[in-house]
Structures are given as C-alpha cells and as structure tokens.
Amino acid sequence: MDNRPIGFLDSGVGGLTVVRELKRQLPHESIVYIGDSARAPYGPRPAGQIREYTWQLVKFLLTKDVKMIVIACNTATAVVWEEIKESLDIPVLGVVLPGSSAAIKSSRSGQIGVIGTPMTISSNIYEQKIKRLAPQMNVLSLSCPRFAPIVESNEINSSVAKKIVYESMAPLVDRVDTLVLGCTHYPLLRPIIQNVMGLSVKLIDSGAETVRDVSVLLNYFEINRSREVKDKTEEYYTTASVLGFKEIAEQWLGEEVTVQHVDLDKELEND
C-alpha cells in the first residue's frame, strides 16, 4: 500500500479529462494536478522548449511526493516521456501507447485516424506505435492546431468551435472507422467531433485508456492507496488564471474544486 498521491501534468486543462476518468475508475486515489495554461498550447512550440517546460512540471510534482506521474499530454509524451521514464525511480506513464493499443483493437477496416497538435503529428509517434503493434494498419494523421486554444478559452460550446472542428476534420470524414483523440484537450470537443465523423466512427480517448494502465501499474508495484484511509486529497495547480482553470475544471469534473496558482520559476528556484 502507498497512500501518496498520483501526479498529473499537462500543458493546461486537457489533462483533466484523464483525471475525470481516474476519479471514475479509481475514486479512492489522491491526486495532484499541474496545468501549465500560462504557456499553453505546447503543440506549436519547439521540442527543446517542450522538454524544458515538461521537466519543470515533473520537478514540481516531485516536490509533492507523488508515487507515480501521468504525463497527461500527448505532445509532452511524444517529446520527453521516454527520457523522464528512464530518469525517475517512480512509474511514469504517457498517453500515446494506451491510445494506440485501443485503436488497433477497435478498428475493423484497418483505417485509423489520429488528430493531435502539430508537434504530436509531426513526431509520427502514433503511427510508429500503431505500426509496430499492427503493421497492417493504415494511419491517417491530421494536425488540429486550433482545437486546444478553443478548450483553454472555454469556448467549446460556441458556434466558432463547431465551425473550426467541421472545417478541420473534413479530410478524415468517411476515410476511417476509428479516430484517436491524440490530445487530452480534445475529449472536451467530443460531441462536435463525433457529429462530424458520424456515429459509426469509434473515438478513442487516449487519456481514458491510460487510466487502465495506471490501475495495472498500481497493482503490479503494490502501491494502491488503502481504501481504509479516509483522508483522500485532491490538489489542483495552474500557472495561469485560477478562475479560468476553476471554471473549466468544475464544468468537466462536475464538482467544486479548489485551485491554486503556482509560479514555477519561484517554486523551483532553489532546486
């Protein structure tokens, strides 16, 4: 047993889609979440910058004595997950491999679509993982740089959001039977994306798939939280507006949350 929290990091609010799934599947686990909304989105940034920012978030989580880290960001997973995983002595999960595995199981035609940030798509990480596991699969990848900013600005129900999604998704319509939401922000746009693609297309939420792997690793390393301990904690931190983060978090999680602002440079200056 290990009653320490699980740490989650993301470029902003997108990783809350993973947290929501964790709260559904493993409601007894404690959580520390850090969203770097002040520097979101990560997708258009150069790899070196993404690496630097992600390591800052990791170091912040380590100050909270987490027992596991979930990189709840596809872009960060693509750039630096392997390095972080090899560097730490606690389990570190990314969101790409679980999403890839689920897509392979779902597809009947062998035609899989992947949407993500410019960095995730240009890295070809999903195509590489899928092809390694199932060489016969055909992967169609599409960069959707305007999606994450819509979510960060909480405009997911706006007419502008619908227009952008419809225009962006057009190249994949009627071409795939399975679509990987290759950015943890994208499940917040799921109803619009599903409407564009049609009900016959299976949408794969890479973050939700990752929580299944979290459960497996908790059992494997025997670091589940004791169900007899009642003082479960949830801490949410943002590098940007507390009010903006809180509004989106409460809408998505369906409950009141306390959010704290963090200045990473000051927090880690003595590191």
Curated annotation (Swiss-Prot):
Pfam families: Asp_Glu_race. Belongs to the aspartate/glutamate racemases family. The keyword Isomerase applies. GO terms for molecular function: glutamate racemase activity. Provides the (R)-glutamate required for cell wall biosynthesis. It comes from the Bacteria. Transmembrane segments: none annotated. This is Glutamate racemase. It comes from Streptococcus thermophilus (strain ATCC BAA-491 / LMD-9). NCBIfam families: glut_race, PRK00865.1-3. It catalyses: L-glutamate = D-glutamate.
